[in-house]
Amino acid sequence: MNVRAILQKTDEMPWVPASSLFGEKLLVDGKDVVFLKILSDRRQEGGGVAEMTRFSPPPGKRIRIKAVAESDEHVYLLKGGHEDGTGEPLRFPGDYLLHPKGLPHSAILSQETIALVIYAGEPDRIMEFRVENADR
């Protein structure tokens, strides 16, 4: 068995459009608003995926996403945050979330948000993704 560390210099890695992995449902008027840096993908070895995710809603808009955790999902917010349906902030940089396998969950993002996301296995199944006016 060949075991070795994986090192990524994240500042040197490009942001990849999430639509290239999850499909056109993540496009808004043909433009990407979600980007990824895949830090590791060990699913072939029975592991999971570690990534940095960047949500970039257009000015005056917010992203609303609903998903189901296909494996335990660990989320650590680095920048930005989530809000509730009225625009009140709910999650902040430094917050940690665990979505256990099978848990339906959602997020509303009206500002650029970057998170470290670690899946124990498969990534989330996205049930709904839309961009809407940020009017409260």
Regions found by a protein language model. Name each.
Residues 72:
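Alpha/beta-hydrolase fold active-site loops
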Residues 80:
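Conserved strand-to-loop "acid loop" that flanks and positions the catalytic carboxylate
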Residues 1-49, 132-136:
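A short, N-terminal "cap"/entry segment at the start of jelly-roll beta-barrel domains
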Residues 50-52, 75, 114:
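Structural motif
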Residues 101-128:
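Ligand-binding loop in jelly-roll beta-barrel domains
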Residues 32-69, 83, 88-90, 100-104:
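Conserved short histidine dyad/triad with adjacent acidic residue
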